């Protein structure tokens, strides 16, 4: 496919130019070895959204905040939920509507204040206060009184019942199978009431992030790096590192150059660079993982051009997913057959990869009386190659997709404001449940906040029924039907592939893991004898 190859060649030259420009600097590995300090530097793109986990869904922000903040529960590297600030898993009433939770005693925030029920109450009430602008209320708004707060009818959460300083009850409006699972997500991290309130709009900016986690933020210029040091008041095992740095490097080639020069100890390895490194000197330092998410072409379903189902169907038919995976993605992906990832219950294993048929795509447009539909796909730098490949595929079917690469921060704001006609991204549930992958993005009330504006009452009805059922087999069948409506009847989204992710880590780095898109760095250790 000459057009595709030409597009990719241009991008490759651009990437090489950036790589050669570089960003030098001497390695500090020898200094840390001589001093006996364990210093770990992780390279990642700058999320540019702050570190307040109530107001963003960015995995890069999570990888930083994850070291400072803790919730009642968390999902570990093995995708199992475990107690953190809660003493035990919740006691659930017979009707499934009341959850009683007891906090561990003796836990302090890094500012020295004690963790009590008041902090948990404050955290949830802040979440549902409209001025906060929380992006994840749909995961918790079944708590009684949450919607009243969101609608400005109340300032306190009626469904939060304080028993004493360490025990509380959460009352919910209906049975919700994933409720405890959602309490284990970063979005439900517990904030210190006094410190958070005092910080106001600056919470999550600079060093204004205080938690009960193993590290505290010492420096954060929000542009180049975040420096963390051990939390001396941590209630758990003493952190392994003396200093943890997250270094912001947006360009993939530059990031790998910094890794090769020893200026960072670990970073993600973009799939576009996999061929360059997989058989070279770094091959033994590469770890590949298969996350639960799906990469897709996200489209604004109420857009004047893309609101026409024929255009969306033609787009799907024009894309050669198998070729995309084998060429652009260097084989580190599987062509999609549904929006739900194969590892998520509700994925239909009987479905085949979405059809690729350029002739049929043209016919679908002709039958609808549509000629040369044109739209713009705005992406971040990391999705540029995928978008360029899609552009070439669509051109063969008579569809013009203009591609613009924009700053990650601008992209996040534009998506939330519903200003993107189309974009490319991956959506990853933090645990294997379709509610977390599909309801969060395409249920009509949530689709607005994601900038896709998908709205189908039949889909909503299936999703609502599934999230209120405790019958796992029934939920699976409901999710299969919902996914089929979303991605094969409405073409409300264009699933592309199930990607594999890679990272590189120096031989002296211990416990390097990627927990389904989020790098959990709090367990990282350094073997100084190998440096």
Model-inferred region functions:
Residues 1-40, 50-53, 83, 93, ...:
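Short, low-complexity disordered leader/linker segments with a strong preference
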Residues 43-94, 210-211:
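N-terminal lobe/hinge region of extracytoplasmic solute-binding protein
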Residues 88-136, 169, 305:
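Aromatic- and charge-enriched surface segment that lines or borders ligand/interaction sites
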Residues 102, 121, 137-194:
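Surface-exposed binding/hinge segments that line
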Residues 116-123, 165-171, 213-214, 242-243, ...:
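Alpha-helical secondary-structure segments
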Residues 172-239, 243:
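Gly/Pro-rich hinge or "lid" segments in bacterial periplasmic/extracellular proteins
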Residues 200, 232-277, 400:
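Ligand-site clamp/hinge motif
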Residues 318-346, 382-389, 415-531:
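Detector for C-terminal structural segments
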